[in-house]
């Protein structure tokens, strides 16, 4: 299984290791990441589509060689677990029956057998957390945990909880945390590092010399959409009603003057009302009802402005179903005359929002130009998935299907893991050429041929924005088109996502420069001793390849020095260098390093491990 073909040379170098099957392409930035990951527990940040998985294979191979303990790779969904197992069985040079899935789909009593038999376990985090907590498994039997999509390791997420358990119960375990986007704030990045016991940061940037030969062109286009007068007329009574309710809450003193109503402002008003109720202020109870109605109306208006009429009606239909279970607040909201009149008028008008037809035209044009194209459409909402799937199915040559999560939502059932995997295979093979997906499709989709990604709306998260764009331009040029409805939440979200992404990369650079994570191990430790690189029948060591490629590519793609860069360099010269911390002191809970497998005086291995 060869990765992207090398663009500069006809000869493709490949990695040679006793526990790897031939075919892993050697890339300098991946070898650099490998060296960091084998030196100490590492957070690897690499753009989507540049082969984080290949680094994971190489790290697993070396741990198979060095130790007899188990290796766990954690992925957020059962679908990704199955995908990781399939790829690892193709690439790892061990008995495929020793690479097993460990998920909640297997009963607990059978998981015990899987744990005992498996050498490499592909797992979901919840099952590892639960079984480790219940002492069904011991994390002390593990030498390495790879956290794929590691940005989840914050707060009470199962990723973070597994990290806590691993650090508390395994003194010598290594961690490799892999992600394209660890978080937009320093706090989020550092929390991931802390929860997973990270000693070291490895960051690969798309525009750096080592990645340039493998970068394919990605076109990012934003399509601004004006709301038609017919839609504005339909929603005007709803907006007027909301404005009156907001004024009432402001007169009661629970909300200040606002230019644009946001979810945060509504939440702050709700908190103010809660404090009033705790003081036994009788006004609080009436205000609480009004604020709840304002929140529901705010959500409805956002849907109508950014998604369309059908999405708004689906929202109200779902609320009506919830109201039948006895939710008095929902029933009160739906019984308002303004809502009743809106539902009657909207059902008679059909879809008024232009986004759906814009998507229809773009899909039709792309498929008519190239029937072999693959198009991936992302949206936040399942009802939009349903509407788009029905709309696109009427276009000649379009073979469209939906891709949603496993949980059920209202009347709509989720997809099973088997259905998800089958759908991806159909998309990959061309049986389906248009896939309409919710956020479940953002992480780790193994779809190398999506030439066009349509984002029905922008997303505020830098993480999710990066992942959506990463679904295209993996092996050939691709296009990302984002639909933004003017004068709506879309515009704010679009600007916020760009700002957060810039901030994320700046924070990574600051953290690395300040030495808050990075540690440089002793040069005597030859972590790549078992890796060779074969080029046109000849072999060199991985270290030699890394040095030669780095020199070659830095000459081929020199860094352009700008005035801003010069000024930054001057400013940095006056900064006090960060205090260096020893590996022994910095490692959490006496965590071992690969340096302990080598003689301190000679730098040679102390003992040789044999394969199982």
Regions found by a protein language model. Give the residues of each.
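Helicase motor interdomain insertion/brace
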Residues: 158, 162, 189, 203-212, ...
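Walker A/P-loop NTP-binding motif
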Residues: 31-42, 50-67, 87-90, 163-168
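Conserved Walker A/P-loop ATP-binding site and its immediately adjacent core
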Residues: 48, 53-58, 68-90, 129, ...
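Conserved segment of the helicase C-terminal RecA-like domain
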Residues: 471-498
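Conserved pre-motif I regulatory segment
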Residues: 2-45
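SF2 helicase catalytic motif II
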Residues: 125-176, 183-188
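Conserved helicase ATPase core of P-loop NTP-dependent helicases/translocases
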Residues: 106-115, 374-378, 384-390, 397-438
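Conserved RecA-like helicase motor core of SF1/SF2 enzymes
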Residues: 143, 405-409, 433, 439-467, ...
